[in-house]
């Protein structure tokens, strides 16, 4: 469901295999080692919720999923820039100070229903807002949906 490579201290898989990892290879990603999370692993980490009304939704929704800082902590990731890659190749990134200042989650569900492909899933990077703050175009660029890969470091 999610592969994380780069400056991580804990790994559970070897290098990219272009035949078996065709979606990763299609995006021209490459790594020697990584950590691969399945849904159960992500659900076992401390979870967070975010209630927001992104442009893709007609009404506010409650999103839930593992806290990004917990995902990164679990794999002993360096506190450096993290790049998020969506299935369609779209990328976004966060710096450590961005991650520390807000409760970012990798949302697995909205209103209790899993986010599927075509519904901003399997994972949607989304965060809490200050009281009264609403997402705008500047924020929306960080809300990467259909996330399946993260790279820690350049």
Regions found by a protein language model. Give the residues of each.
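N-terminal intrinsically disordered, low-complexity segments enriched in P/E/S/T
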Residues: 1-154
